[in-house]
Regions:
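Basic, Lys/Arg-enriched alpha-helical interface segments
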Residues: 1-69, 88, 105-107
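Enriched for short, Lys/Arg-rich terminal
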Residues: 1, 72-107
Length: 107
């Protein structure tokens, strides 16, 4: 594990993304798959991004320095977790969960 444990929280948009993922699969007749993806994405975000070293090494998506929006690619790079890290407060805000095949999100 890394240097410090960070507090990770999901924004409203990130929570809505998880709901949309579950709905997407439910509409395709695979509700269990959607629930599993949503649960696994949430767990991965809170586990991985609570580690300061992991959070610091996310690829910069937009901005720079303390205001940089970073991304963590997960599940064989199929999903992207966009987040902001505030080193001073020790908090990470998960902004969006995004499938890699979709157009770039507006953040």
């Amino acid at each position: 594990m890394g240097k410090a444990t960070l507090q990770v929280f999901l924004t409203t948009a990130a929570r809505e993304d998880l709901d949309e993922i579950a709905i997407y699969w439910m509409e395709r007749g695979e509700p269990e798959r959607g629930e599993k993806y949503a649960e696994d994405l949430h767990r991965t975000a809170t586990t991985e991004l609570s580690d300061e070293d992991t959070a610091l090494h996310g690829k910069t998506f937009a901005g720079d320095g303390a205001t940089a929006i970073r991304e963590l690619r997960v599940f064989k790079r199929a999903y992207r977790i966009f987040y902001l890290m505030d080193e001073q407060s020790g908090r990470v805000a998960v902004l969006r969960f995004w499938h890699s095949r979709r157009d770039e999100p507006e953040l």
